[in-house]
Amino acid sequence: MGINVLFIYPNTFGMNMLPPAIATFSAILKQHNHQVQVFDTTYYAVDYGIDSDGSKEQGLNVIPFSKEMEKKNLRIKNTNWKTDLKKQLEEFKPDLLALSATEDMWELGIHILEEIKEYKQKNNIPVLAGGVFPTFAPEICSKHDLIDMVCVGEGENALIDLCKKIENKEDHLDVTNLWVKKDGKIVKKNTISNPVDINKNPIIDVSLFEENRLYRPMAGKIYKMFPVETIRGCPFTCKFCNSPDQM
């Protein structure tokens, strides 16, 4: 039967690359009979951050593409993200909320969780934080009272194990890659699992996202595209970058 998993992707307009991790997790979870949805803020007017691609256009860093976006009808939604999210929660009734974020997305992610704090607490829904920022700053991410677990590293195996334990109403303190909190304090920092063989991952589930998320500006035109993951980490060892730590 499985459980309902709602991914929260606190993205800002202009950062249009579809997140391959969430699309991969969706495909894997569906293979294990779980139901998956995503709340993606990319096309909402959230009054947060900047329009990345738009600012590049204004700064003459890229060929203007605004008219091309209008032709594709790629515009900010005219609905309120708070209303839409609460409606999705009531209809989907998630058993797990999974926040995926980079450092620049983290504050918006927390803002979203604050907005649904009452619903989360009333229905006792656990929140898992994962992604680049939680992986490299689990101490910071785990401090927030609305975060129940932090995934450090790859999430494929951790998500499968966690969802199975939630479905069976079992304790999830021993799920690898997870830092788990109880009563507001970290009670378990589990070990990191062996690297995932990405060649065994299924094709990403792009159906999880609205079609407009497949469009992205390039050279002044708007193209339909999606990312393909061929490797994780980076073979280079630049002093200013944290990627070598992943290898």
Language-model regions, residue ranges each:
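Core AdoMet radical
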Residues: 13-14, 95-105, 225, 229, ...
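Nucleotide-activated donor-dependent transferases that construct or modify glycoconjugates
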Residues: 3-14
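Radical SAM [4Fe-4S] cluster-binding motif and immediate context
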Residues: 199-247
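Glycine- and acidic-residue-enriched helix-capping/strand-helix junction motifs
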Residues: 13-22
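Generic structural signal for helix capping and beta-alpha/helix-loop junctions
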Residues: 15, 46-48, 53, 106, ...
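Glycine-rich beta-alpha loop elements in corrinoid/cobalamin-binding modules
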Residues: 7, 21, 25-29, 37-43, ...
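Residues that mark the start of a beta-strand
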Residues: 2-5, 35, 224-227
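Glycine-rich, highly charged phosphate/nucleotide-binding loops
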Residues: 47-89
